Amino acid sequence: MDRTCEERPAEDGSDEEDPDSMEAPTRIRDTPEDIVLEAPASGLAFHPARDLLAAGDVDGDVFVFSYSCQEGETKELWSSGHHLKACRAVAFSEDGQKLITVSKDKAIHVLDVEQGQLERRVSKAHGAPINSLLLVDENVLATGDDTGGICLWDQRKEGPLMDMRQHEEYIADMALDPAKKLLLTASGDGCLGIFNIKRRRFELLSEPQSGDLTSVTLMKWGKKVACGSSEGTIYLFNWNGFGATSDRFALRAESIDCMVPVTESLLCTGSTDGVIRAVNILPNRVVGSVGQHTGEPVEELALSHCGRFLASSGHDQRLKFWDMAQLRAVVVDDYRRRKKKGGPLRALSSKTWSTDDFFAGLREEGEDSMAQEEKEETGDDSD
């Protein structure tokens, strides 16, 4: 594991000084510095073991950066311009040696992580622009396109293992169950799709929701499936109850464009209004704001291999890092308070939009409000 995800080392208590070394000490930040791109990034992924971040932008360029909390140490390692149109998604292989990218040009590329060299190109992998990518294991990956097509690929073979088109609109996002048997798809037609990739067959589509389904993830140890939507609502499905929603939760957001789980109960959402919200699932609550891309839509979110950093890309052409360490602990151990309806979102860090102490705000609430909330909570914990 790289040092950025480790605890900061204690300072050496020695009084000895090197007379030849008079340089100012390196500044250590809470998070790595922002990365500025020439175009918005629509694909974002962290390396599974090293402090590397990959991004693919709307011009078709792919970048890999090394990131660090030491000021001035976040750097571009290489870039690739092999895609002819926008790069829609990127993903590292399980061993971290390869980077897979998909594009509006309908191609799948496999790049070497160390040098950025193109090792394999699958041209015209789909008949329509590819919009989403998910790695199943070291050899198998799934792709979804703008017309609802789903393909399953084995990198050791030519051609797709599975090619299905059950959705009527674009595939926005995909997720996998822990057994790697069922592929879940969120589509612009408002339906959650279920595909059995072990038997290579279609299972079912859920009832259509009123807006596009833009994201999908498993929560609550696989017992719940959460889907974000273009109307700003999170739809919840019970596992093995995919036909209809079990619950829904409307955020005060124009839309939910991307979503990433932080714990089994907490996820972060990115919206058109530029705000990154931390949301607790069952009980359903907006915990507060992790950060924002001021006035610009959030395009993609990714969580680092150690879980400490959330990275976000926005239409402001910046990649930003947000510290998740304290938030993860509070949600799991301490967070029991209900946010007042109609009030502003609570800032979860000094980087959000204020320097207020979010945790002090929680501590100041009285015990009576906690008791009242616990009494009311039975109405929130729907199955």
From Swiss-Prot:
KW Phosphoprotein (keyword) present: yes
Name of the gene: WDR55
InterPro entries registered for this protein in UniProt: WD40/YVTN_repeat-like_dom_sf, WD40_repeat_CS, WD40_repeat_dom_sf, WD40_rpt, WDR55, WDR55_POC1
GO terms classed as biological process: rRNA processing
Domain of life (superkingdom): Eukaryota
Sites of Phosphoserine modification: 14, 354, 382
Biased composition (Acidic residues): 12-21, 365-383
Keyword Signal assigned: no
Stored SMART domains: WD40 (SM00320)
GO CC list: cytoplasm; nucleolus; nucleoplasm
Basic and acidic residues bias locations: 1-11
Name of the protein in question: WD repeat-containing protein 55
Family from the record: Belongs to the WD repeat WDR55 family.
Entry-annotated residues carrying Phosphothreonine: 378
